[in-house]
């Protein structure tokens, strides 16, 4: 029986940093703060919208837990849902997902991005029909690296075996916490050297992913 595949979103299936960069700077400019560079914004991505807002506030010289947090968070999430043009697929994603679906792999996305913005980004890049389930950063009481999202995805997908596919330090820890093999996409938002992150397999081109899954040996 083909395994369940549980994917991260940002930095794994889609390059969302340009979209997040634009939305974040729109929020900052609306309040008179200086815009930030793409690399700096990219370094804030992966731990959810609350973390991103705290980073923006800190960089702007404001209290990250202060009275501005709620308003900026609400503005950011609202813009996230409609300003999706900067989200793009990594090369080869659609072809790989088509092959994985043909192999009988049920698939889910677990992301720290809020649920509605995640759905909007997924729809924009044409991924909606490939996934049985999407769990966002505000869908459950916890976010990754807590394994609750992944455990819920496994419950819904109902397969005895599963792989977790992501790109970052958070993803490596999530897979470890969930007790799943971690397959890392090396072209995402990882900051740590690859050899320093525990992983069971790696790929830099999505054309390799179906072969990795098909050849997996389960102990």
UniProtKB/Swiss-Prot annotation:
The reaction(s) this protein catalyses: 2-phosphoglycolate + H2O = glycolate + phosphate
GO annotation terms (biological process): DNA repair; glycolate biosynthetic process; reductive pentose-phosphate cycle
Record pathway: Organic acid metabolism; glycolate biosynthesis; glycolate from 2-phosphoglycolate: step 1/1
Residues binding Mg(2+), per UniProt: 8, 10, 167
A GO term, aspect molecular function: metal ion binding
UniProt enzyme class: hydrolase
InterPro entries (alphabetical): HAD-like_hydrolase_sf, HAD-like_sf, HAD-SF_hydro_IA, HAD_2, HAD_sf, PGP-like_dom2, PGPase_prok
Pfam families to which the protein is assigned, alphabetical: HAD_2
Keywords: Calvin cycle, Carbohydrate metabolism, Hydrolase, Magnesium, Metal-binding
Cofactor: Mg(2+)
EC number(s) from the headed UniProt entry: 3.1.3.18
Gene Ontology CC terms: cytosol
SUPFAM superfamilies the record matches: HAD-like (SSF56784)
Residue positions of the active site: 8 (nucleophile)
Record-stated family: Belongs to the HAD-like hydrolase superfamily. CbbY/CbbZ/Gph/YieH family.
Role of this protein: Specifically catalyzes the dephosphorylation of 2-phosphoglycolate. Is involved in the dissimilation of the intracellular 2-phosphoglycolate formed during the DNA repair of 3'-phosphoglycolate ends, a major class of DNA lesions induced by oxidative stress.
Protein's name according to its UniProt entry: Phosphoglycolate phosphatase
Organism this protein belongs to: Rhodobacter capsulatus
